[in-house]
């Protein structure tokens, strides 16, 4: 019988090869002469799965697989040990040691739509197979489960009134215990549905039926809240008396929380929505102030203004223009008494002589032109002063 090494065993078996550089004659070896001692358990090592077969059992399984599923099912019940339903899904107990623990060349089982690849019957296959069984949901008969669920919905409202009578009524409403048991317990493996061994998981609705039957024996104050009801009633107060629902697990409703930020925060004190606080430039709002004026004061100011205008029209020099007029009159008087004093309003008067040591020299136009470089390019476009004989003689 041919055996194939796993990748992990091939890597570990490479250390047993000779370390010489000479090429090893692999072609001289025969497959029948391979040592199967690597596949056996070492001292103190035990199998942690429930699928330990001998060579005779493996050959029988291959014959049954070729013969059909009808012969395979009674043989499977004799070979496979009886496994409890509760411990088969999550526990992997140790099994008896089997010296002839080999890998099957091909184990074709029809699951789904196509054949699965061959798997070795070792601990890796046991772990992978048990993980697959956990994810498979057992089929159930809806014609049997639906009436039971409908009766639980009706009887849940009367649960607080008379739990003892409800317990008796539940027993009377189940005329076929074998069929109702199929709702709460998974069906056995049949050749028409699947070829997986062992029990399968029950549906969420079946777990709900078992929980309903167990809750009827517990007082209302001590009943634990189920897990799916805590999720579905997250935003509501958990009240089993007024809920009146033992719904299927597929009808669990989860509240959706909006992730968008609220632009208006609700003020609990005033009951109004606050605007979003923004940082930036604050534009002040001008507040209007009311000023009170007496009618008599307005008439008095009006008379003063009219009298000033009329006086200025009649005699502009002698008219008093207020404070500014008084200042102008004072400066005129000082300038008349002291001619050397420059009037502040005389902006055209240039009196640079008082800042110089030498007296101011006066020049004619031609002299000024000669002193300021007549040949300069700035004066090239100036016209000739032909009207002056002095300038014309200078040009010649």
Curated annotation (Swiss-Prot):
Pfam families: S100PBPR
Keyword Nucleus annotated: yes
Annotated Gene Ontology cellular component terms: cytosol; nuclear speck
Keyword annotations from UniProtKB, A to Z: Nucleus
Regions of compositional bias (Polar residues) in chain numbering: 202-215, 227-246
Compartment(s): Nucleus
Cysteine pairs bridged by disulfides in the record: none
Example of a GO MF term: calcium-dependent protein binding
Protein's recorded name: S100P-binding protein
């Amino acid at each position: 019988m041919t055996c194939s090494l796993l990748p992990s065993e091939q890597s570990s078996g490479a250390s047993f090869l000779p370390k010489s550089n000479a090429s090893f004659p692999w072609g001289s070896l025969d497959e029948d002469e391979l040592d199967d001692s690597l596949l056996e358990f070492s001292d103190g090592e035990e199998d942690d799965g429930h699928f330990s077969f001998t060579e005779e059992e493996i050959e029988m399984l291959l014959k049954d697989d070729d013969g059909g599923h009808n012969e395979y099912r009674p043989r499977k019940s004799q070979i496979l040990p009886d496994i409890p339903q509760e411990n088969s899904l999550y526990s992997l107990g140790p099994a008896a040691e089997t010296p002839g623990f080999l890998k099957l060349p091909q184990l074709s089982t029809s699951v789904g739509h196509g054949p699965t690849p061959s798997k070795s019957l070792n601990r890796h296959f046991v772990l992978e197979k048990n993980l697959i069984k956990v994810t498979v949901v057992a089929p159930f008969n809806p014609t049997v489960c639906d009436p039971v669920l409908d009766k639980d919905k009706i009887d849940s409202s009367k649960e607080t009134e008379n739990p003892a009578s409800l317990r008796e009524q539940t027993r009377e409403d189940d005329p076929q215990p074998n069929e109702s048991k199929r709702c709460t317990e998974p069906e056995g493996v049949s050749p028409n549905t699947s070829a997986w061994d062992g029990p399968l998981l029950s549906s969420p609705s079946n777990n709900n039926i078992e929980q309903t039957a167990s809750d009827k024996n517990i007082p209302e104050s001590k009943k634990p809240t189920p897990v799916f009801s805590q999720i579905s009633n997250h935003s509501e107060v958990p009240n089993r008396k007024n809920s009146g629902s033992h719904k299927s697990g597929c009808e669990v409703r989860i509240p959706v929380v909006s992730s968008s930020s609220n632009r208006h925060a609700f003020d609990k004190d005033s009951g109004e929505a606050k605007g979003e606080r923004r940082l930036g430039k604050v534009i002040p709002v001008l507040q209007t102030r009311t000023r009170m004026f007496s009618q008599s004061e307005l008439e008095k100011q009006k008379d003063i203004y009219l009298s000033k205008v009329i006086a200025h029209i009649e005699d502009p020099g002698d008219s008093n223009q207020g404070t500014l007029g008084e200042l102008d009159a004072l400066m005129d008087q000082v300038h008349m008494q002291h001619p050397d004093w420059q009037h502040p309003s005389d902006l055209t008067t240039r009196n640079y002589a008082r800042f110089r040591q030498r007296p101011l020299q006066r020049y004619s136009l031609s002299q000024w032109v000669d002193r300021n470089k007549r040949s300069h390019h700035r004066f090239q476009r100036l016209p000739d002063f032909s009207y002056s004989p002095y300038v014309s003689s200078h040009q010649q």
